[in-house]
UniProtKB/Swiss-Prot annotation:
BP-aspect Gene Ontology terms: translation
PROSITE patterns for the chain: RIBOSOMAL_S7
Organism: Staphylococcus aureus (strain bovine RF122 / ET3-1)
Protein purpose: One of the primary rRNA binding proteins, it binds directly to 16S rRNA where it nucleates assembly of the head domain of the 30S subunit. Is located at the subunit interface close to the decoding center, probably blocks exit of the E-site tRNA.
Keyword Transcription regulation: no
Oligomeric form and interacting partners: Part of the 30S ribosomal subunit. Contacts proteins S9 and S11.
Protein name per Swiss-Prot or TrEMBL: Small ribosomal subunit protein uS7
Record keywords: Ribonucleoprotein, Ribosomal protein, RNA-binding, rRNA-binding, tRNA-binding
Record Pfam families: Ribosomal_S7
PANTHER family: RIBOSOMAL PROTEIN S7
GO cellular component: small ribosomal subunit
HAMAP family: Ribosomal_uS7_B
Amino acid sequence: MPRKGSVPKRDVLPDPIHNSKLVTKLINKIMLDGKRGTAQRILYSAFNLVEQRSGRDALEVFEEAINNIMPVLEVKARRVGGSNYQVPVEVRPERRTTLGLRWLVNYARLRGEKTMEDRLANEILDAANNTGGAVKKREDTHKMAEANKAFAHYRW
């Protein structure tokens, strides 16, 4: 932790094609080894595939998918009297989008399609239709929070 106050948040520049900060954040999540050009190519070709397969605007479908993935509750471990409790807590808005994007990219990478463009496009379409690995992860997170509702009074 810094000694002299908190570190200011760096602002993300919107991407050149869709003019969306959310798209830039997704590009940053896809990017490996600083290869932004490759990440942009993957995302924009995935968006083209989404438009072809759904017949709707890719940005619309993507935003719908992210809204279906973002968690509202999660559990945090809290040590009380020698035992650990999984305490349900609300997720801050910024963390919601971060988790949503992280889960989308991770579950896209785990899919079986041949190219990353295909995997990402299919994961976005699945998430928009409330199916797929990322949405299942959100459901599991919510189930954990629901199951541990009894420990909600340990919140800090």
